[in-house]
Amino acid sequence: MKHNMQILQELAAKNGPLCVGLDTDPSYIPESILKTFKSPAEAVLEYNRQLIKKIADDKSACCFKVQIAYYEAMGLEGIKVYAETLKLVKESGLICISDIKRGDIAATAGAYARAHFTGDFETDIITINPYMGFDTLKPFTEYCTKAGKGIFVLLRTSNPGMVDIEQKELKDGGRVLDQVGNELKRISQEMKATYPDQTCSPVGAVVGCTEESDAKALRDAYKDIYFLIPGYGAQGGDAKICGTLMKEAGGTVNSSRGILCAWKKDAGCTAKVENGTVAMSDIVEAAAKAAIASKEDLLRF
């Protein structure tokens, strides 16, 4: 059995390293289109449906990352759209990363693991916050072993506030993120041993591409760990930094707003928005073009 991180690594080699983030806020859809649907959640689902199909057909990405918060913000209907979006990604043949960033005591973590690795919200890979301790990872890694699931653990994030904790120096030397990384390396190696015939571990790391200064050092320190790389595009990270982070075991580079809101920089779309003739297919086409351009940009490195 191949685990999902291995499948993702292989899809990235085949389709390119782009991950399309489905952080689909209703405000990312033109008002004139929103008005044609019964609810904002219904409009979001249709945008996701058309975009997932187009991206899969174009082979411009290896996976989708679905940020649960945007769906929770739409209430019960939004949660239903979240579940339906996960199914649409699964049907596309690409990997689904659920960006849930869960982290809690082991008993609660077990409930989170069941919630997102089985049932209505079942997904391929999830993001995990390790800051309540590494024992909180065990319920998730158990699913990596028995069901081929994968996890990305926060290591060096892409937000400016990461300096508040991740970059803090420890009295015994090194930074907080280095201590997290060393433990993550140990866990990743243990998990890799359960899949000796595969080229990566089901345990990966989230490493943002907004800081060039330590990109090479991080890649060198964690050569055998597959990276989820946020921060490309709207957050200011560039393809050169991504190229450094994608070396060794590799990685997938996420872009969300840069793709979902690409219509705002498309002259044809903005003209149609102004005269009230823009259709969902127009903003999907703009997003698809942005995905192809992002893939080509990333492949330069």
Regions found by a protein language model. Give the residues of each.
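A C-terminal functional module that forms or caps the active site or interfaces directly
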Residues: 205, 209-254, 258-268
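Conserved N-terminal beta1-alpha1 strand-loop-helix module at the mouth
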Residues: 1-66, 71-84, 90-91, 279-299
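Conserved anion-binding
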Residues: 100, 104-204
